[in-house]
């Protein structure tokens, strides 16, 4: 797995196009597991920052299939919950009290219906979540069971020696509901690699050169 992120408008979608240009993509497709995501609010250069919905998923899947020159996607993931997330060190300021529970339940039903259509059409095989909480994941899991819709097979959340949030209620939930963790930032954006050396001799082009706080991983105590 080679995770990437469209940090700029001019590079958005480049990874999918690179995969689509692999000479062996068609010949060895059954040997590959390809995962990609639909993003929502946050990246204004992708569908003008529209939230995740059935229509944005449909459009994004078709675009990804064309870009990657493939007939199907193995794991299709929701990049962010529309209601917000505590990832990237926002766990101490995350406040769910203003969220609309009914709107979220309706959103889950709508998206599960869309995922069901895509699975039946052979365009995706499985779907997963990303940057989701234990409560949010449990809603997706239970709704899929109740409606006989495609179940959540994976969740891509941060996990490293410096970020152990998953070890709490998420680990228990994922164990019992058979949801696999696809950990991102296992080296804490490079902090655990030792290459930053306290900010001295900062490697050109590194994450820290572009984001000195490394997504909240560097603060007054770290």
Regions found by a protein language model. Name each.
Residues 1-38, 54-58, 71, 114, ...:
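N-terminal binding-site loop/beta-alpha segment at the start of enzyme catalytic domains
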Residues 2-18, 44, 83-84, 134-137, ...:
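Acidic-and-aromatic substrate-binding clefts and catalytic sites of carbohydrate-active enzymes
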Residues 29-32, 71-75, 125-126, 150-154:
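Short acidic capping loops at alpha-helix termini that bridge into adjacent secondary structure
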Residues 30-44, 155-159:
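A short, structured active-site edge motif that brings together acidic residues
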Residues 42-58, 97-106:
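Active-site mouth loops of central-metabolism enzymes
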Residues 51-69, 108-113, 137-142:
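Short, acidic/polar
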Residues 65-91:
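Active-site groove signature of glycoside hydrolases
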Residues 81-222:
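Beta/alpha (TIM)-barrel catalytic core signal, keyed to glycine-rich beta->alpha loops juxtaposed to Asp/Glu
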